[in-house]
Amino acid sequence: MGALPDAQAQQALVLAAQQRLNAAPQRDAIAVDSRGPATALHALLATRRSRRSFGPDAIDAPTLTAMLWAAAGIVADADATRTTSPSAGALYPLQYFYVNLRDCGAADASCPAPLAAGVYRLTAAPAGRLHYGPIDADLSRSCAAFSSPQLLDRAQGVLVITADFSASAAKYGPRALSYVPLEAGHAAQNTLLAAAASGCHAVEIGGFIERELGRLLGL
């Protein structure tokens, strides 16, 4: 552990990463099947970008829920219920919170009420639905919870993924420290892809202040 690199050193790290990405030999490389069943997914993956600028218009509640469901949703199979992302041992340690930074309205009659600004706990419901459990309508702590609060400017909201490691640790011991964050990454990517499919900008951020974020979420 040590001091963070300065701006010039950070840029050098980014440049080195780009060089690694472009260092693969072109000869004998196998092309992706452009007409295969995964073509639409490949196109979506190519579209996904980390975008830190957001428009002035609010996202309607059904569109927002579709993006959040990609991470926090459940799917009922014939023999069991599972989440939208893989979970080691089917223990499902992840918990989801959503900070709605501005009101979003109802798009149609299927969404009977707008979603007010505030902090919510997300709980998956059957048939592709999410329940927003209100925690707090006061968003005054939101800026203090993130190390780069300017990213919140014009953003519709923030999905926060937390986890209870206890069940995973009981089964897997220290490996839970790898398995649970891996699962969180799966869930986050699901929402980022859903945002890309919806034509919305989104970015994953890790710069948060644990204590302040915990207070914001009521943890």
Label the model's feature ranges.
Residues 217-219:
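A glycine-rich helix N-cap at a beta->alpha junction
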Residues 1-154:
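N-terminal amphipathic, basic helical "cap/leader" segment at the start of enzyme domains
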Residues 48, 67, 96, 157-168, ...:
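Small-aliphatic-rich amphipathic alpha-helix that forms the alpha element of a beta-alpha
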